Amino acid sequence: MRIVRSLLAVAIGSIVILVFYDAFLQFLTQPYRNICSVNPEFKCDGTLFALGPIEGLSARMRIAGYGGLIFAIPVIMWQLWKFLVPALNKQEKKYSIPFIITSVVLFLAGGSLAYWTLDKALEFLITWSGAGVEQTYQISKYISLVAMMVLAFGVGFLVPVLIVFLQLVGVITPQTLIRQWRYSLMGTFLLSAGITPSGDPVSMLALAVPMSMLFFVAVLIGFIAQRKKAKRNPEGE
């Protein structure tokens, strides 16, 4: 039933995207048009092209699908948390609302950062494609790149939430995380490089740096939660 609710939320989000498709398409292609307009040496006019009569429809459905998934993230996170709740104790269950709100806010923050980074990433990629190379982008591939960037950044920003959760349920301690912080940061940069679809250093750093900062915030929250738990149960020290 939880899967059905999540799929229904995706479907509703997709319908909303289809109704306002032109506005969303303009929004998604704005970064590409921006770099073309301010960099005439890039030899592009901001126009996307379709290879065949079906590709335009395919791009429309991709935008609807990806957009529906992004819009449904709050519902999906809530359903996932409700699935985990039975395995939690009473003390852990009280974190439900803060976890959901934080997860949604961080996902949206990550997605927004991806969109803001997109023109910088495209500028880097176009520059490194070489002088005199005319830039003409296929609409379906461009839309997939934008969508995967947003999803990658959004999911990347959720990793600290997972770290906090694992500390609260006792799977890992903040002391262990802080001792291994160098490996954690290395893992953060490797993860950023792995999930960034464009593969450019601009996007990788734009994701890795805030993820690293959020890692330390997550560890700090773990220490605070550990101290509060020790005060509630002094005999457990």
Feature-to-residue mapping (PLM):
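Membrane topogenic/interface segments and analogous intrinsically disordered interaction regions
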Residues: 1-237
